[in-house]
Amino acid sequence: MALPEFSMRQLLEAGAHFGHQTHRWNPKMDRYIFGSRSNIHIIDLSQSIPLLHQALVKVREVAAAGGRVLFVGTKRQASDPVATAAKRCAQYYVNHRWLGGTLTNWRTVSGSIARLRELEGIMGGESAGRSKKELLQLTRERDKLELSLGGIKDMGGIPDIMFVIDTNKEAIAILEARKLNIPVVAILDTNCDPDGITYPIPGNDDAARALQLYCDLIADAVLDGLAAGQANSGVDLGASIAPIEPTLARELTPEPVAEAAAPEVAAAEVAEQEAAFEAAAAPAAPAVEPAPEAAQEATAEAIEAVAEEPAAS
């Protein structure tokens, strides 16, 4: 993925350039105001575009480093877009009511989150033996905690950056973030105070289409950062595996059969067996007897030798 892209036309079509009535403005927003039409301030989108891009880059960096991003928007128009965008990018949100001390008193809030998990366990299958009245009370308590803490119950600590819609309504959340040095990305309408906002984005904070566009861009930046973080920390498992040691390779190699290991010896044994078989199968050859003439000559010589012995004596 790449950093989400947007254009001036998208912002104009979403109505991001419309501010509040001229008599409801905050003079500190004067540098972001282009002019007024029909007593309505017009926001200078030529400044909003680079500021929005800068905010998206920061959100992407935080997500790539494994940081937590908290979406905050408790006004009616922002509630659903904030929750939907946060869930889509696996981040956290507060869209019902900001509880004082959510960030600065996180230990106490963690206790409330533990109670919420306990109630979820009770209602999920441990409700046996409880009366209907008791179950009704537990359900109401769970629903109340879910509205305020359901979006941050898995956060596990304070966020690394916070995205806020309507700084006037979320003034307490911004104050807590400033105390903890948490960067704040905020949509600033013409009636807002830009002081203390780390990454201001001048724009309409009431139009539904504009709010949806802001939330989608922030969520896309988070997703891009998560993808970049995985790519940077990913390990090529195939390249990391060391080659097999020679001794281990020999142990793992199956031994060949005798005929394959010693073909010459096997061939000699087979030849000997075949020769023995042929010899056993062949008929026995008759004994060789001396010729009659040779036998007679040998007998005559023996008689003459015996006859000459007395004469010599």
UniProtKB/Swiss-Prot annotation:
Instruction: Report if keyword Transport is assigned.
Output: no
Q: Where is this region: Disordered?
A: 281-301
Q: State the Gene Ontology terms under molecular function.
A: structural constituent of ribosome
Q: Which GO terms describe its biological process?
A: translation
Mind telling me which InterPro entries this protein's record contains? Answer: Ribosomal_uS2, Ribosomal_uS2_bac/mit/plastid, Ribosomal_uS2_CS, Ribosomal_uS2_flav_dom_sf
Q: Name one GO cellular component term.
A: cytosolic small ribosomal subunit
The record's listing under CDD domains reads: RPS2
Task: Report whether Repeat shows up as a keyword of the record.
Answer: no
State a single Pfam family of this protein: Ribosomal_S2
Keyword entries, A-Z: Ribonucleoprotein, Ribosomal protein
Q: Which family does it belong to?
A: Belongs to the universal ribosomal protein uS2 family.
* This protein's name: Small ribosomal subunit protein uS2
Give the originating organism. Caulobacter sp. (strain K31)
Identify the gene encoding this protein.
Answer: rpsB
